[in-house]
């Protein structure tokens, strides 16, 4: 179904408004449906960044980094399914080189404002976290804590390792201790996740948590780019709610424009709830 056909019910819900106002609202809703999220993924060498991305996301992947760019620039990859795009920024992990960490601090300060979310991968068997903690406090700081989702990766390597196809009770207990340790060290805004790509363990919960952590405008296109098993009811309903709330916020913003006459502002406020309901109803056609 074409976008203009999907927009028709929304247009009908705005029919009481002057044409230029309804067109402005529809234009912003259309832009919202084409929002391109940018997600950073960081972790030390061998943390499993690529395997996690491949496990979570579907779509065609194309590198977008300029080969002539500065070597300090992070690698960027663009994912596409249909009309939906997302960029993944591969950020270097800290704690492997003191000289590099100074460079990385500058890189992160430059990149953080542009990212919707950062997945910070910490290996289940990584005990050297002092540098990570320092970096989190000094570089990420209060301003961007809400953008960080900590993920314990390679949970199948938690002690005692067995190489089997399921996590043992002892491994799960040690993973729980690791989660508590990370909460204690970093005091993150969002709950810490734990996954094993090899065992396909914890990925659904992590995907749902990621959708909940994203800014409202970003959650729907990310859901559209998830592998099918992770497009769960929980993830989809969170994104649908976010989409409706964002459409409502668009109406609120337009109603505050200085050129909007008071009677038109009253109409916008009167139709807000019905427009949000329609937006939620047509979400499936967009995403």
From Swiss-Prot:
G domain mapped to chain residues: 48-140
Residues involved in GTP binding: 43-50, 90-93, 156-159
Gene Ontology biological process: tRNA methylation; tRNA wobble uridine modification
Pfam families cross-referenced by the UniProt entry: MMR_HSR1
Recorded GO CC terms: cytoplasm; cytosol
Leader sequence segment: none
An annotated Gene Ontology molecular function: GTP binding
Classification via InterPro entries: GTP-bd, P-loop_NTPase
Keyword vocabulary terms for this entry: GTP-binding, Nucleotide-binding
Matching SUPFAM superfamilies: P-loop containing nucleoside triphosphate hydrolases
Record's keyword annotation contains Transit peptide: no
Superkingdom of the organism of origin: Bacteria
Family: To E.coli YkfA and YeeP.
Protein name (database record): Uncharacterized protein YfjP
Source organism: Escherichia coli (strain K12)
């Amino acid at each position: 179904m074409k976008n203009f056909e999907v927009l028709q019910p929304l247009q009908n819900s705005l029919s009481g408004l002057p044409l230029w106002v309804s067109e402005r609202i529809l234009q912003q809703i259309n832009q919202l449906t084409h929002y391109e999220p940018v997600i950073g993924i960081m972790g030390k060498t061998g943390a499993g960044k690529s395997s996690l991305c491949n496990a979570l996301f579907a779509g065609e992947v194309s590198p977008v980094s300029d080969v002539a760019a500065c070597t300090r620039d992070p690698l960027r990859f663009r994912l596409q399914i249909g009309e939906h795009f997302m960029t993944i920024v591969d950020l270097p992990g800290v704690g492997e080189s003191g000289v590099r960490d100074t460079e990385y601090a500058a890189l992160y300060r430059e990149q953080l404002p542009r990212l919707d979310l950062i997945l910070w991968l910490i290996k289940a068997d990584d005990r050297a976290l002092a540098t990570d903690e320092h970096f989190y406090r000094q570089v990420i700081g209060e301003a961007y804590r809400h953008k960080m989702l900590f993920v314990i990766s390679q949970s199948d390597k938690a002690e005692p390792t067995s190489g089997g196809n399921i996590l043992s009770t002892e491994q799960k207990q040690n993973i729980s201790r690791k989660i508590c340790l990370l909460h204690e060290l970093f005091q993150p805004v969002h709950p810490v996740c734990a996954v094993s790509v090899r065992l396909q363990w914890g990925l659904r919960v992590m995907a749902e948590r990621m959708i909940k952590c994203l800014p409202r405008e970003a959650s729907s296109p990310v859901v559209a780019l998830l592998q099918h098993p992770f497009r769960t009811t929980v993830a989809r309903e969170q994104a649908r709610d976010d989409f409706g709330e964002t459409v409502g916020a668009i109406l609120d913003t337009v109603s505050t424009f200085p050129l909007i006459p008071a009677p038109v502002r009253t109409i916008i406020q009167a139709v807000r709830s019905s427009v949000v309901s329609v937006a939620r109803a047509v979400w499936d056609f967009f995403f």
